[in-house]
């Protein structure tokens, strides 16, 4: 699935792929064992500062979300990846794409959430670039990607633009109405 070579068999992250961000990292599909790290990330209020929603309140919520993410990955052949620092294996965050309806069509929706330690390191750009290329190479994936973020989340909006997404006039698919939708033709990433 990756156009980058996997780590050696001694990698602490099975099926890992090297990233190219300023902070050297690996990507690997999420697994049930990632639950403790995902819970710490998604319960940290700092990682939700610019979102219209707040952090998760219970580990059970994170377990249900992780179950949905794993099911989606199994069903669609693509999904979210754990991002770990190369060498140390420290969990830095999660990034990837998942299929979702947008209007009357299906798109590959972009997701990224990083631990504060990884902010501003280039990891989000590098991880999502890799994920976009991998999804674009799949015959069964949607041909369009979406990046939906809070209107006031300027760092995420800049990230979308760095990745080549274009601000669209698409209606906010969330209940809050406080989001913008960026779109990207995945044919451009093959």
Q: Where do the PLM segments sit?
A:
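Conserved GNAT-fold acetyl-CoA-binding loop/helix
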Residues: 46-68, 79
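Short, P/G- and charge-enriched loop/turn segments at secondary-structure junctions
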Residues: 68-70, 169-170
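Short loop/turn motifs at secondary-structure junctions and domain boundaries
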Residues: 71-76
